[in-house]
Amino acid sequence: MLYIPRMGRPPLILVSPSIEKSGVEFHDLSASLSVRYDSAVLAAGGLPLTAPATTDRAALAECVRRADGVLLTGGDDINPELYENSFPKKILKTVEQTPDGGERDERELVLIEEIFRQRKPLLAICRGHQMLNVAFGGRLVADIRQQVPGALNHQRLDRPEDLVHEAALTPGSLLSKICKAQVLGVNSTHHQAVVRPAEPFVATARSRDGIVEAMELRPELAGKLPFLLSVQFHPERLVQKHARYRAIFQRFVEACARNKIKKS
């Protein structure tokens, strides 16, 4: 069932795509986006619009200005040079960067800067969650299996629509209020992760091996954005089966709708 916010026309949600080495039309670099993101935004009452594959700062700033909120999505690994000076070769071999020479990394760093400068609602998912941490000087685990002793298997690509492990939520956090839960089952399709949030953020969900499954702005900084929720798991792949994950998109779209009214 389509969820319709109470606030007039649907808010415009800027969605950051992945990049593929060979697209279906001319087999060159192409923007790529799972339809699950668009479906989840539409079902929550938003209107998704894919961000252009450019690093032009002025163009990206204008995209953020026209949007009522931004969704940062999953995809290939972030360039480790952005958060770590050196890694052993055996770890670097596991890193699969975007095929565009780092342009997606550059583009999303600009988008994040503009989101905070223009104070737009933000929902960050998987890679987007990691990029948000990197943008503020945080570090990542480049390969969980090699760097986190006793870690769970977080790379369950065979079960993207299933709840494969649990995350403990911080009582009173935005995520716990949205999902009305203290423990949340999540899917898990990643091999990199945040283990320590950057300075503006606080972890609000962790798996039992310490991996940060969600982070939000620190309470004293919560006013910096109208809405910020950053999650490692993929709620867009869970919305059809579980109402609490639909609520994540509904709350995000509601925040975007309020932002739309405020700027009109």
Walk through the language-model features, giving the residues of each:
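Active-site loop->helix "elbow" adjoining a glycine-rich segment at hydrolase catalytic centers
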Residues: 127-129, 136
